[in-house]
């Protein structure tokens, strides 16, 4: 399995071999940890990861799209081939791929990622959920139970590369 940047670069290598000038690729990874609490007890813990790569090919004004959830060289080559074949099935349209701007700001300046959040584990999220439950009950004596309480931690990593020199990555995370 290739890393995200290797996978995107592999698509651009395949496009160069075929002589395509206008190709872009997006790779995205999402991780989440979700805790459900009911009546001061953990009822459910779910952890999930999703990964995907999308390819857009412009061939003589025709746009072809394809994707894969596997970052193996074979799966990426198959997705690229599908995008090329899908382009042949489309009517030509006016689409312009933009060249890379002179400067793309570093996404870290957006403040979307806090590495400390990725360290929160099941126990930390459970403690947070239970403290929220206690705080709500303490705030109003009429609250006798909370039928559903969920706490989750998620992180996202995105990468965009194009045959025109665009290279942009962004990382974000949250606790909700």
Model segments located where?
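Active-site bordering "gate/hinge" segments
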Residues: 1-176
């Amino acid at each position: 399995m290739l890393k995200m940047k290797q996978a995107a670069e592999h698509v651009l290598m395949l496009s160069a071999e075929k002589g395509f000038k206008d190709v872009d690729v997006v790779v995205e990874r999402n991780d989440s940890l979700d805790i459900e609490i009911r009546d001061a007890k953990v009822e459910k813990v779910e952890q999930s990861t999703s990964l995907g790569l999308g390819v857009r090919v412009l061939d003589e004004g025709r746009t072809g799209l394809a994707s894969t959830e596997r970052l193996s060289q074979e799966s990426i080559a198959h997705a690229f081939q599908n995008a090329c074949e899908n382009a042949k099935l489309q009517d030509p349209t006016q689409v312009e791929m933009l060249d890379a701007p002179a400067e793309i700001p570093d996404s870290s300046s957006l403040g979307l990622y806090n590495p400390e959040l990725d360290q929160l584990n099941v126990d930390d999220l459970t403690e947070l959920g239970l403290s929220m439950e206690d705080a709500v009950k303490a705030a109003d004596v009429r609250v006798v139970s909370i039928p559903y309480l969920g706490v989750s931690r998620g992180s996202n990593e995105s990468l965009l590369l194009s045959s025109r020199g665009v290279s942009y990555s962004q990382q974000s995370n949250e606790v909700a």
